[in-house]
């Protein structure tokens, strides 16, 4: 049991998207149950972690690309769970997580995008926004914090901002987690019932819930006016937490596959550096390193090629399959040269 369809195809907002008719308990594109979804997510997480590390390495080497994941949703929709369970599968040093609550006094004194720009992911990193600049056309609209002529102008400002962001090398993924009215009530009640969850509850949650219809209208307009080719919206059913997390994992992974991050080439003479390092090692340490070289490097090659092959399967790219075979040959030739040099260095002792 797995994905029968690329979730990007079934979750992406279309021109005729109707939020009122959206099935918030569904699992579009997936034909399995919860245990299947959790297994697929865990397996895909290994690929996600490898791709994230490549993107991070690319950034360290001077690359300019990054990925921004925007997660929106009403209270209890599962935004925090995405950060913990999805991004928790990758190296935290490559992730920049930012949660946007009520603007501080300083933030409120600036343009609404000021605090967003300050939190954008740096090259090589994945940025995750728990709430975002869309609060300024959702909360500020429904709560009448700013007049209509102000928040209506923001749709266009957001589109221009995201277009420039993409042009600068940041891929933007926008997820709206849509929980049903009944499911939200169940989750809020659980927070009240459990002593260890009460810290998550606020009396204001009920005030927000009382404006459910207004928030649904605001979200519908967000999809209508800010769903663009360069930064599309993916609306995710949120009544099943496992599906929400699995779907977002799949979309992020497939997006990184399409980005094709690569391990950067060394900008120094590897053989020369190896020789200099060997001169600082004892004979026994150098021999131990030589003995471990083949198994260590072969394992790394196999792991990297496995990732490539899994990515190729997702993309269905025959040309990429040939490139993967060629890459294996090049790495194996490099290993042969490495073993030859280290053997010569050891024999020269």
Language-model features: where?
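Glycine-rich phosphate-binding loop of ATP-dependent small-molecule kinases
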Residues: 1-349
């Amino acid at each position: 049991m797995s994905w029968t369809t690329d979730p990007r195809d079934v979750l992406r907002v279309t021109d005729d998207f109707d939020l009122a008719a959206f099935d918030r308990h569904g699992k579009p594109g997936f034909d399995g149950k919860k245990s299947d979804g959790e297994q697929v997510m865990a397996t895909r997480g290994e690929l996600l972690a490898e791709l994230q590390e490549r993107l991070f390495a690319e950034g360290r080497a001077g690359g300019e690309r990054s990925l921004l994941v925007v997660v929106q949703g009403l209270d209890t929709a599962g935004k925090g769970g995405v950060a913990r369970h999805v991004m928790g599968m990758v190296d935290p040093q490559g992730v920049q997580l930012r949660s946007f609550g009520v603007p501080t006094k300083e933030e409120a004194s600036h343009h609404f995008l000021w605090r967003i720009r300050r939190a954008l992911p740096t090259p090589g990193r994945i940025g995750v926004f728990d709430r975002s600049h869309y609060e300024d056309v959702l909360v500020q609209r429904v709560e009448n914090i700013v007049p209509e002529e102000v928040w209506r102008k923001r749709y266009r400002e957001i589109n221009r901002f995201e277009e420039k962001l993409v042009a600068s090398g940041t891929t933007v993924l926008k997820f709206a987690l849509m929980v049903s009215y009944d499911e939200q009530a169940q989750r809020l009640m659980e927070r009240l019932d459990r002593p260890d969850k009460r810290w998550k509850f606020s009396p204001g949650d009920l005030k927000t819930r009382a404006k459910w219809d207004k928030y649904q209208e605001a979200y519908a307009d967000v999809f209508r006016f800010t769903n663009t080719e360069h930064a599309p919206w993916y609306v995710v059913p949120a009544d099943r937490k496992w599906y929400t997390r699995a779907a977002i994992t799949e979309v992020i992974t497939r997006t990184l596959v399409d980005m094709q991050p690569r391990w950067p080439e060394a900008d120094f003479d590897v053989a020369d550096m190896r020789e200099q390092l060997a001169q600082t090692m004892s004979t026994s340490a150098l021999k131990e390193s030589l003995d471990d070289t083949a198994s260590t490097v072969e394992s790394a090659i196999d792991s990297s090629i496995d990732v490539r092959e899994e990515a190729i399967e997702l993309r269905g790219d025959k040309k990429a399959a040939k490139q993967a075979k060629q890459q294996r040959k090049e790495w194996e030739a490099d290993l042969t040269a490495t073993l030859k040099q280290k053997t010569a260095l050891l024999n020269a002792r």
